[in-house]
């Protein structure tokens, strides 16, 4: 079956966002990444920066895993999750597209027309890339990578009860440090 929807989960600095944009451009479809954050912000009334950051934090922060009782009601993060879930489902119904991050692989797991991709790379490739592409100036880009990936993994586990980056959750996993950004895009396009 033809894959109308492509979801790209990625390690920070692996080039997943760039790969998603290339795939969408080559397939003539839309890529939802920053656009998805803008849509979530517009519909929720929250600031874009808050929405962006909320996608990497579990509700309640560090102690959330110890205190999962929601007797005080849903958190802002929970409300954003529900809205994000609905918007991603609507986008997938509306048109062929590439969706980067935001647990889209989980949200669309029941769709047979969805190709789920995970992009990763070794620490050196990613550290070099965030310094070169994003101008990262921290003393230890490796520490930043570990922190971002840890947050993404915790968010993913919290809302999906699945392990982020586990190959069993995706149709294909690509090492952008070995294969290269452009070739990763071509591989995905060939599978769509």
Region spans (language model):
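Glycine-rich phosphate-binding P-loop
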Residues: 8-24
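Short beta-strand-centered segment that lines the nucleotide-binding/catalytic pocket of NTP-utilizing
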Residues: 30-42
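ATP-dependent small-molecule kinase phosphotransfer cores
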Residues: 41-96
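Small-molecule kinase domains that catalyze NTP-dependent phosphoryl transfer to phosphate-bearing small molecules
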Residues: 59-66, 78, 137-181
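RNA pseudouridine synthases
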Residues: 91, 104-110
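Conserved phosphate-donor/acceptor-positioning beta-strand/loop module used by diverse small-molecule
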Residues: 110-133, 138-148
């Amino acid at each position: 079956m033809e894959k109308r929807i492509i979801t790209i989960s990625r390690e920070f600095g692996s080039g997943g966002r760039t790969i998603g944009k290339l795939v969408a451009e080559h397939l003539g479809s839309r890529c939802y990444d920053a656009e998805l954050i803008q849509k979530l912000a517009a519909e929720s009334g929250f600031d874009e920066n808050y929405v962006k950051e909320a996608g990497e934090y579990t509700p309640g922060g560090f102690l959330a895993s110890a205190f999962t009782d929601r007797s005080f009601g849903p958190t802002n993060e929970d409300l954003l999750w529900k809205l994000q879930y609905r918007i991603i489902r609507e986008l997938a119904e509306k048109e062929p597209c590439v969706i980067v991050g935001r647990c889209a692989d989980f949200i669309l797991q029941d769709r047979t027309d969805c190709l789920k991709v995970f992009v990763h790379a070794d620490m050196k490739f990613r550290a070099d890339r965030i310094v070169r592409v994003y101008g990262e100036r921290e003393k230890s880009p490796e520490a930043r990578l570990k922190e971002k990936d840890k947050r993404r993994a915790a968010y993913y586990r919290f809302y999906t009860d699945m392990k982020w980056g586990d190959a069993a959750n995706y149709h294909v996993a690509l090492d952008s440090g070995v294969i290269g950004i452009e070739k990763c895009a071509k591989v995905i396009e060939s599978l769509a």
